Amino acid sequence: MRDLHAKKQRVPHNRVKKPPKERKPINWGPILKFASRGFGGAALCAGLGFGGWQLYNLVSRTTLLRLEAIEVSPLKRVSREEIITLAGVRPGDSMLKVDLKTVVARLSKNPWLEEVQVRRYFPHTLSITVSERAPQAVANVGCLYYLDDKGVLFKSLVEGDRLDYPLITGFTEEELAQDPKGCQEALKNALALIDTLKNGGVFSLEDISEIHYSKGYGFTLFTMQGGVPVKLGNGGFGEKLTRLAGIYKELQPQMQALDYIDLDYADKIIVKKV
């Protein structure tokens, strides 16, 4: 007989019981050390911030940094008292609590002031430097406005404002809103025309009562004597006015009988009688 013997069955590895691993205790030391550093840093920052704020409040309440001197640059149209009142500062104010941007914003509301600079000089001085606008003409745009040398309408006229400036007409508030750049360019051209007239000899700014602008045509002058239209168009003002100056003395006795003078030609002048 065959000798039969039972084979040993292999036990799967996943069924082999292994001795449990020994767990290592968590080392809390480095973790607590790191956390304590973080909390300590945060507490330090908070303490410094709070301390700085308390120091700021303390210094701002003391008399050590109080405003004593307010320096204002010399002005022609706006008084020193008006500047200080508009700035909203006064001696005794805390130097630290004076907000320079706020002071600049307040002063910029005055239309006469073109540029404003405010500086703080510790311990006791505030310096206000401003430049004023200078009117070059009066423009009628539905109401009267002063025009500065940059072609900017900066102030509406009120009772008591001077009117002895060249008068510019032909612009409307609607046109200014719809085409601000185009209107400003035309106003600059009007200023160039005024400068040309100021330098005139026989025919000058004193001979003009009004400078009228038409978007489709250009410029037309109206004479002081008789209100005669002098058509200029656009550009070449110096050459055109020089030609008129050559015959203006002859025309002066006839001004009441003239309908218009047309200079908008390259080589001639048209004088039309009524």
UniProtKB/Swiss-Prot annotation:
Main function: Essential cell division protein.
How does the record classify its membrane topology? Single-pass type II membrane protein
- List all topological domains (Cytoplasmic): 1-33
Q: Where is the composition biased (Basic residues)?
A: 7-21
Q: Which HAMAP family match?
A: FtsQ_subfam
Residues assigned to the Periplasmic compartment are 57-274
Provide this UniProt record's keywords sorted from A to Z.
Cell cycle, Cell division, Cell inner membrane, Cell membrane, Membrane, Transmembrane, Transmembrane helix
Keyword hit for Transcription: no
Domain of life (superkingdom): Bacteria
Identify its protein family: Belongs to the FtsQ/DivIB family. FtsQ subfamily.
Q: Name one Pfam family in it.
A: FtsQ_DivIB_C
Signal peptide region: none
Q: Which InterPro entries match?
A: Cell_div_FtsQ/DivIB_C, FtsQ, FtsQ_C_sf, POTRA, POTRA_FtsQ_type
Q: What is this protein called?
A: Cell division protein FtsQ
> What is an annotated GO biological process for this record, any one?
FtsZ-dependent cytokinesis
Gene3D superfamilies, alphabetized: Cell division protein FtsQ/DivIB (3.40.50.11690), membrane protein fhac (3.10.20.310)
What is this organism's lineage? Answer: Bacteria, Pseudomonadati, Thermodesulfobacteriota, Desulfuromonadia, Geobacterales
Report the source organism: Geobacter sp. (strain M21)
What are the subcellular locations of this protein?
A: Cell inner membrane
Q: Name one GO cellular component term.
A: cell division site
- Per UniProt, residues of the POTRA domain are 65-133
TM region(s), chain numbering: 34-56
Region: Disordered; residue ranges are 1-24
